[in-house]
């Protein structure tokens, strides 16, 4: 199973491929490609997937009016999903799920494919009006839909329509004939914004990810408790070479600028893509900060045991937390006082070559593999380390994501007297191979360019 899940696709490249092959219309957009794992036909598979959201800004200018923006173009539809390690004979993704309505080539249930809440849903809409919503393109015509979910706030009364007319600065709820007693308004539809409205005291991970659980599309956000007052703990902002970690990472930058020296994987915020239902599942029951919030808001949090087994199977170790822990461990793996004082064994996060041959810090990545002495393959988040100002690999850390092992960090160190090539050295060896370098030179001609993949 480890070899069957070696990743051939990079999410940046796959995102543009999804957009080209599966957006199907100009007003559909894939915001991001997420990586998850599913048991499909008895096999544990690593899968890349993305939600097909509706981007109203891409609607043709002649069709952009109040009715279309607020009443008709209300939701995206379905997703694209493909295995990390397969391509077709044309070199394209071998889709597990594709098209509209969704067509699945594996045993995966999609009972509700509509996306009213997502990462691209940045404006408010009305449902339950007298006009049918655009559902998806169907041949020369369009399929329509009437929202029947529990999401949204009822505005059936004149008083409520008046309040929201004032709130949104539009008289349409009062002057339009489209509204009925069943009408609803949906706002705070962006999942990050929605979660922040409910739990502003949790620091949310920068990468909400999509999961298909119990036949429905779910957005999962990792929620942290943070503090700048933990005794004898070094703030993230004072760690060695922290600027390399923070580059292009606004969430981590905000965390560092606030003086954070305490962070815990406190909760998972789960938002249903169809009705916007938000559940907050507690992860770390021993976190004193979370425990305090639970006492203040006793009805806000849900015990982890209440989540369905299928939903829990998609929880993973948080990205930003792993980045912070890896950053701090560069120095704090040293347990000899003198060695630590002199910073003799300081590690760094490795460099890798990216697009346009630019060099940047390697990001953690997800794999399915069997750890030494483990019973079987599991979903891991891993990151290698190199010595400071050197490129050979000295260790790699793994965060376990599955079942009872969730949250365990495992470090594997290599003998200091043995050379183990690091990512940048492997890139150099690739460039030094005459056959490969010749192909790279050929492909980089006549306006074409080679995109270097993630190692």
Regions found by a protein language model. Give the residues of each.
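Soluble extracytoplasmic regions of secretory-pathway and membrane proteins
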Residues: 1-455
């Amino acid at each position: 199973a480890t070899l069957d899940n070696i990743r051939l696709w990079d999410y940046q490249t796959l995102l543009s491929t999804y957009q080209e092959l599966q957006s199907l219309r100009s007003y559909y957009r894939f915001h991001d490609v997420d990586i998850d794992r599913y048991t499909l036909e008895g096999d544990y598979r690593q899968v890349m997937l993305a939600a097909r959201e509706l981007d109203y800004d891409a609607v043709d200018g002649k069709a952009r009016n109040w009715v279309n923006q607020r009443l008709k173009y209300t939701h995206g539809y379905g997703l694209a999903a493909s295995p990390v390690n397969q391509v077709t004979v044309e070199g394209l993704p071998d889709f597990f799920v594709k098209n509209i309505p969704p067509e699945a080539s594996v045993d995966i249930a999609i009972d509700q494919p509509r996306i009213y809440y997502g990462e691209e849903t940045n404006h408010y809409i009305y449902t339950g009006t007298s006009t049918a919503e655009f559902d998806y393109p169907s041949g020369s015509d369009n399929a329509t839909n009437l929202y029947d979910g529990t999401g949204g706030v009822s505005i059936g009364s004149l008083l409520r329509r008046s309040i929201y007319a004032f709130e949104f600065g539009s008289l349409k709820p009062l002057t339009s004939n489209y509204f009925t007693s069943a009408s609803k308004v949906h706002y705070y539809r962006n999942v990050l914004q929605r979660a922040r409205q409910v739990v502003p005291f949790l620091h949310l991970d920068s990468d909400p990810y999509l999961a298909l659980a119990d036949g429905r599309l779910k957005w999962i956000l990792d929620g942290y408790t943070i503090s700048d007052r933990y005794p004898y703990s070094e703030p993230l902002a004072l760690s060695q070479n922290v600027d390399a970690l923070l580059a292009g990472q606004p969430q981590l930058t905000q965390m560092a600028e606030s003086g954070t020296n305490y962070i815990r994987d406190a909760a998972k915020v789960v938002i249903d893509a169809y009705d916007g239902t938000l559940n907050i599942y507690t992860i770390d029951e021993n976190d004193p900060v979370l425990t305090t919030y639970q006492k203040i808001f006793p009805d806000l949090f849900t015990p982890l045991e209440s989540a369905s087994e299928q939903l829990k199977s998609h929880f993973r170790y948080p990205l930003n937390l792993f980045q912070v822990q890896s950053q701090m461990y560069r120095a704090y793996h040293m347990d000899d006082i003198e060695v630590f004082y002199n910073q003799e064994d300081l590690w760094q996060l490795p460099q890798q070559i990216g697009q346009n041959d630019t060099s940047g810090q390697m990001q953690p990545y997800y794999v399915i593999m069997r750890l030494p002495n483990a019973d079987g393959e599991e979903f891991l988040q891993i990151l290698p380390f190199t010595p400071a100002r050197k490129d050979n690999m000295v260790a790699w850390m793994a965060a376990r994501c599955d079942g009872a092992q969730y949250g365990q960090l495992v470090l594997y160190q290599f003998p200091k007297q043995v050379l183990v090539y690091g990512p940048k050295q492997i890139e150099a060896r690739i460039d030094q191979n005459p056959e490969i370098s010749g192909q790279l030179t050929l492909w980089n001609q006549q306006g074409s360019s080679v995109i270097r993949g993630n190692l």
